[in-house]
């Protein structure tokens, strides 16, 4: 009997790619999403998941639901017997979190507390949580390993991820029957090789690569580069970009780990290589054959100069390594953008 996995926020960018990998690995994903950051499409399914069904030839069970809706969550857990929960649902824009801290704390913290309480009540004590490298704050050393201090976060989004990590750690400490894998993502980019699913930000992209690809396709005039006076090789910010398919596969490895009764484990998911903004622009120009105009503007509050992972622990304990490099990330991102110039709203 295939094992059921609840995926919260599963219609979003990382969620939809993970649902695809779950199906390929033989799991039965049940997806909930409130469409805050997902495209509705015409049918009963979010467009991203409709396409996942097409790609895999398997059906996806989906319910429109907000994790703040306690009654709906209760009904869901009564209806299904879940082996584990992969928890993506949450607000995720750094800049917006500075403007709207209460929204971020309400959705991310209250939503997660409710989810954990309902999991506990139904005896579902296996969790994969999508955390973030933002929990490290300003790096004290590089590359960042899991032992690097956390909590010196520069914005409410990062703080909310840090607080949730602490809650889950405390829960696993108090009750040894809980197992949790906390995955600290670095900077996901790229898209599925088919070009059928990818990142489709609602509104102006907050992240570099979707913005760059929208400039390349002509949706936006020029890229703003936030600061070129950082202490890096070319003065622009350096980040660890990871292919979203590699990231999604990390969640399958995390589910396997849960079966070992692992307690609470924490892993970086990154490549271990940092690239600057200008290196990413050049790589995207190469992949797309387009010139990408940019202008340098003031630094963005809360941005750090450089941030990249030491991913060796995930390799040792999860058997997971990022396999897809920079050129592949950009080629796949460009294929998605070219086939879907308006994102999921593009009519075939």
UniProtKB/Swiss-Prot annotation:
Name of the molecule in the record: UDP-glucose 4-epimerase
Keyword Ribosomal protein on entry: no
Names of the cofactor(s): NAD(+)
EC code: 5.1.3.2, 5.1.3.7
EC supergroup of this enzyme: isomerase
Residues annotated to bind NAD(+): 12-14, 33-37, 66-67, 88, 92, 161, 185
Domain of life: Eukaryota
Family note: Belongs to the NAD(P)-dependent epimerase/dehydratase family.
Subunit text: Homodimer.
Recorded catalytic activity of this chain's protein: UDP-alpha-D-glucose = UDP-alpha-D-galactose; UDP-N-acetyl-alpha-D-glucosamine = UDP-N-acetyl-alpha-D-galactosamine
InterPro entries per record: NAD(P)-bd_dom (IPR016040), NAD(P)-bd_dom_sf (IPR036291), UDP_G4E (IPR005886)
């Amino acid at each position: 009997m295939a094992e059921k996995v609840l995926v919260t926020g599963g219609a979003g960018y990382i969620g939809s790619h993970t649902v695809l990998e779950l199906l390929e690995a033989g799991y039965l994903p049940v997806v909930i999403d409130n469409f805050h950051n997902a495209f509705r499409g015409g049918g009963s399914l979010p467009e991203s998941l409709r396409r996942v069904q097409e790609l895999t030839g398997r059906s996806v069970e989906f319910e429109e639901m907000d994790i703040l809706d306690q009654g709906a969550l209760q009904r869901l857990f009564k209806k299904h017997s879940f082996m584990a929960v992969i928890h993506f649902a949450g607000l995720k824009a750094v800049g917006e979190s500075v403007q709207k801290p209460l929204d971020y704390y309400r959705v991310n913290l209250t939503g997660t507390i409710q989810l954990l309480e309902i999991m506990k009540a139904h005896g579902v004590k296996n969790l994969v949580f999508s955390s973030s490298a933002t929990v490290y704050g300003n790096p004290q050393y590089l590359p960042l390993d899991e032992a690097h201090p956390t909590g010196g976060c520069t914005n409410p989004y990062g703080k909310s991820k840090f607080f949730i990590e602490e809650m889950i750690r405390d829960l696993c400490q108090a009750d040894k029957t809980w197992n949790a894998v906390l995955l600290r993502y670095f900077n996901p980019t790229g898209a599925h090789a088919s070009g059928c699913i990818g990142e489709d930000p609602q509104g102006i992209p907050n992240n570099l690569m979707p913005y760059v690809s929208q400039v390349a396709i002509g949706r936006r005039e020029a890229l703003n580069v936030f600061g070129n006076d950082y202490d890096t090789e070319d003065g622009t910010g350096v980040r660890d970009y990871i292919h979203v398919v590699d990231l999604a596969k990390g969640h399958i490895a995390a589910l396997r780990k849960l079966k070992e009764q692992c307690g609470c484990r924490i892993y970086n998911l990154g490549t271990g290589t940092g690239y600057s903004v200008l290196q990413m622009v050049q790589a995207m120009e190469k992949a797309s054959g387009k010139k990408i105009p940019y202008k340098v503007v003031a630094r963005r509050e809360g941005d750090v100069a450089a941030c990249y992972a030491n991913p060796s622990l995930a390799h040792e304990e999860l058997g997971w390594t990022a396999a897809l490099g920079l050129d592949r990330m950009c080629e796949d991102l460009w294929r998605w953008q070219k086939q879907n110039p308006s994102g999921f709203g593009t009519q075939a």
